């Protein structure tokens, strides 16, 4: 991914927190030179000094079979993004787009049945445990679980390279930066308001 120096993020902990908060990613592989992608909720864990991404495909999704021929995988994550009008700058310029994006490259392998059950248990806990009536793995009937496991294929990806870009108007002067925040706050688009919040948070960390 092309990343100008202003926008490059290298803090591993910061990136890891980002992908866990924006865990609906895009898994990209190739088959005979043709890219294939699936959008999936993903899990994350760290063992020793290595990071892993976990997830599962529907059995009927042919993409999982590409892991057998090609282990190399790209996983993409995206945060809020927003259009930035150059009318918000103090000097003439062209419009642009602010965004957060992380690309992770790695080697994929398939999960065994017990590993898949563990991955699903953790995922359900993440999204359900805070609810009034949480749907947790150990609360579901064995018959239902067995049926569901037959319909999906689990995988894990050992992360080998991480590229992260947070384009948050870091290349603008203070006046322009503050005005971009104000203008984004006035936009009706929820993404724009989230982008304004991110830019404010970044500014506070610099103070």
From Swiss-Prot:
Query: What is one Gene Ontology biological process annotated in the Swiss-Prot or TrEMBL record?
Result: sporulation resulting in formation of a cellular spore
The record, for SUPFAM superfamilies, names: FMN-binding split barrel
The superkingdom of the source organism is Bacteria
| Keywords annotated in UniProt | Sporulation
Q: Which Pfam families match?
A: FMN_bind_2 (PF04299)
Report the family membership: Belongs to the PaiB family.
Q: Which purpose does this protein serve, as stated in its record?
A: Involved in the reduction of extracellular and cell-associated protease levels, as well as in the reduced levels of alpha-amylase, levansucrase, alkaline phosphatase and sporulation inhibition, when present in high copy number.
Q: What is this protein called?
A: Protease synthase and sporulation protein PAI 2
| Protein's organism | Bacillus subtilis (strain 168)
